[in-house]
């Protein structure tokens, strides 16, 4: 049985190792630019994606899109494959709110990476009255929000969401997944999300006593 287990592991890992050798030869010897979708960055967790952030930092794992509300609860979580640009995800995130809760939000605050004139126009067309992008990328405050006051409120709200993400990483282990496989990766993320929401609801209940 032990020999069969080892044989099974070799059958799984040898093709991955050969793919790593191939992509290394293409990149180093032939000078070819290997597309990220073709790269194997871990033979033990072959589902791992290469994630570039702000064209500076490189991470390995999967991009996670979180949506939070005024209740401090996490309202939605998307665990993505590949490294799609944030600007390509804006409409989907809004549509998911409509699918889950039956309506679009009246106000929204997003990272600068989600900003574009097309995304702003699309959001306004869905009835979202105020859309605050952390970095306007050519958009004026008057285009995004009905007033500078609302814009500042939404910016502060987004800062609170960022603080919540830091808490997820620091206290609930969301900075690094220790479970094996992509399905387990998703379970790990959702366990942190559910735990965070349960803690938030418990704090609210305790504050009422």
Predicted regions and their residues:
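Basic, amphipathic alpha-helical segments enriched in Lys/Arg and hydrophobic/aromatic residues
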Residues: 24, 149-209
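Short C-terminal domain-edge/linker segments immediately following a structured domain
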Residues: 96-98, 107-109, 138-142, 162, ...
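Polybasic low-complexity intrinsically disordered regions
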Residues: 1-106, 110-112, 120-122
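Short acidic (Asp/Glu) and glycine-rich catalytic loops that position anionic groups and cofactors
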Residues: 42, 68-75, 102-103, 138-147, ...
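An internal, acidic/charged active-site-proximal segment
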Residues: 2-5, 100-109, 113-155
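Hydrophobic alpha-helix feature that most strongly marks membrane-spanning transmembrane helices
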Residues: 71, 79, 95-102, 113-114, ...
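Generic structural "secondary-structure junction" signal
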Residues: 42-45, 76, 81, 116, ...
């Amino acid at each position: 049985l032990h020999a069969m287990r080892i044989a099974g592991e070799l059958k799984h890992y040898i093709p991955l190792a050969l793919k790593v050798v191939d992509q290394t030869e293409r990149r180093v010897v032939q000078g070819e630019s290997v597309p990220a979708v073709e790269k194997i960055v871990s033979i033990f967790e072959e589902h791992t994606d290469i994630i570039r952030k702000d064209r500076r930092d490189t991470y390995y794992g999967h991009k996670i899109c979180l949506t939070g509300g005024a209740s401090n609860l996490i309202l939605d979580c998307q665990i993505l494959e590949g490294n799609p640009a944030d600007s390509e995800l804006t409409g989907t995130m809004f549509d998911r709110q409509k699918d889950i809760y039956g309506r679009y939000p009246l106000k929204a605050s997003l990272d600068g990476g989600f900003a574009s004139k097309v995304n702003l126009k699309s959001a306004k067309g869905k009835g979202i009255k105020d859309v605050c992008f952390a970095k306007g990328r050519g958009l004026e405050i008057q285009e995004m929000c009905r007033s500078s006051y609302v814009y500042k409120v939404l910016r502060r709200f987004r800062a609170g969401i960022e603080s919540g993400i830091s808490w997820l990483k620091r206290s609930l282990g969301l900075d690094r997944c220790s479970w094996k496989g992509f399905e387990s990766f998703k379970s790990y993320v959702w366990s942190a999300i559910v735990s965070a929401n349960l803690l938030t609801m418990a704090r609210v209940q305790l504050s009422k006593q």
